[in-house]
Curated annotation (Swiss-Prot):
Residues 178-195 have a biased composition (Low complexity). NCBIfam families: PRK11653.1 (NF008655). Belongs to the UPF0441 family. Residues 204-223 have a biased composition (Polar residues). This is UPF0441 protein YgiB. Pfam families: DUF1190. The gene is ygiB.
Amino acid sequence: MKRTKSIHHASFRKSWGARHLTPVALAVTAVFMLAGCEKSDETVSLYQNADDCSAANPGKSAECTTAYNNALKEAERTAPKYATREDCVAEFGEGQCQQAPAQAGMAPENQAQAQQSSGSFWMPLMAGYMMGRLMGGGAGFAQQPLFSSKNPASPAYGKYTDAAGKNYGAAQPGRTMTVPKTAMAPKPATTTTVTRGGFGESVAKQSTMQRSAAGTSTRSMGG
């Protein structure tokens, strides 16, 4: 009987210990989860063109050219599209717009609308691009086109923004920054035209959301 009681006591001690270790295990798990979140960021470089990239990465001229050309193709597919040149210029400034290829993501009915009014539709010039190492061996680079406005009245004035309107700071090539990996993910193709000022509104909303998120993060870290 004494032996049986001893076994029961050991079982109770084991159960008690397991229960009281659980918070520690949870804390360790949380640390690993936070470490995983930190690894979700990626360091990217911002360039205006392939020459800028090549100058900053000696021996990588071919990769820089490929990334630049891929960014141009991505810009054609995802950049905001306008039915008229005037709408595009009002947002991005004189000399910052070009006719977009008819196949660049637009639905046939929207192509017809744009062509009826101006013979084509319009998009901003690619002002630069983000470039970062691809995961999985680093065999190549991921890239994301960036746009910028020369119109002081636009929320995108003097800023690098992506096709979704997210702001990446001053339009100064040669910078390196850390961005979420989602920033380098392909954006959906633009299938409709944007009204005048519509892209600027998107930039303003994105900037407000970014500031709000940054403030929340700061408060959380500060307790």
